[in-house]
């Protein structure tokens, strides 16, 4: 019989409260962008940056791989893994969110113009190659949070904890190496949550 539960097609689930992360992401993005100025850094932000940039916790050879979890190439890689596991909606969602985040980040960089920390502050410790281009917002932070947000409904408890830790590590690492200021990564995280949550509204959650 085709009416048995085991043979029913799995339809995506959409809930009204799924719009809440969209609003939270948008709020974080806006609040991070408002204090940003082209030629100066707010005193509180500079103080936080000095702490994160000045401390030596791990050697760069260990920090660098963590940062790559926010590389844009993580998106197609994660989508391929999802497809290999036959999680088709997850794979499509990751690709949509990755493309949306990339395009949105480019647009925001043209509107909220700010340079890199070493062009705005003195005595910045740059670890690895100096980052180029505009500083706000952090694409690495945006990608890491986007991937986590889209994958969230498919993750178990431990997977969610690991995902949050890794996404936070990407954000902190970008400040630590001198590539971004704190508001840059906050804005990137907000964008990632915003876009990822919007995509979940489109593709739906698994039952």
Where are these regions (language model features)?
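Hydrophobic alpha-helical transmembrane segments of integral membrane proteins
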Residues: 96-121, 180-194
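Membrane-interface elements of multi-pass transporters and channels
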Residues: 55, 85-88, 110-119, 158, ...
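Membrane-embedded catalytic cores of phosphoryl/pyrophosphoryl-handling enzymes
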Residues: 122-207
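Structural signal for the C-terminal ends of transmembrane alpha-helices
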Residues: 2-9, 81-90, 151-156, 198-204
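Interfacial segments of alpha-helical transmembrane regions
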Residues: 15-25, 78-104
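Aromatic-anchored segments of alpha-helical transmembrane domains
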Residues: 30-33, 99-107, 165-179
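Membrane-water interface at transmembrane helix exits
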Residues: 49, 105-109, 113, 152, ...
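N-terminal transmembrane-helix/juxtamembrane module of multi-pass inner/ER membrane proteins
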Residues: 1-74, 109-128
